[in-house]
Amino acid sequence: MKPASMMLVLALLAGAAQADEPAASAPAPSNSVAAPNPFDTVKMPGGVEYREIAIGSGSSAYPGSTVLVQYTGWLQNPDGSRGSKFDSSRDSGLPMTFVLGEGKVIRGWEMGLQGMKVGGKRRLIIPSALAYGAKGSSSIPPNSNLIFDVELVGVQ
């Protein structure tokens, strides 16, 4: 037998031997969907976005409940990052207290605080229409989107 023919026969035999081995099983297709990460950013109807920083374990905030909130607020830069700080309850150490749902705070807070539990921390990204809008406020220019880090310290 010629060397080239011998090589061909050996190659065919080697391939046939490998074909007899069981093929590695492919993973079975899965219909399950990975659970969403509770720390992903969530966009609410109306445009408020929030991201859980820490999930609380106490009572939940709901309309009609008196909430105590520590917060820091920043203007949002055009690239989405935090801009200059305009207010913080942490500067005084006293939480802001109000009844959720009575319209005493900006609408973005009314929406973004609902469902939080005492001890929870969230970052809220609030479009200008749900903040101070075209009028702005003393330290907030008109049409500014805002970023707040909030901590729910109590519910009554």
Briefly describe each language-model feature range.
Residues 2-156:
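Cross-family detector of peptidyl-prolyl cis-trans isomerase
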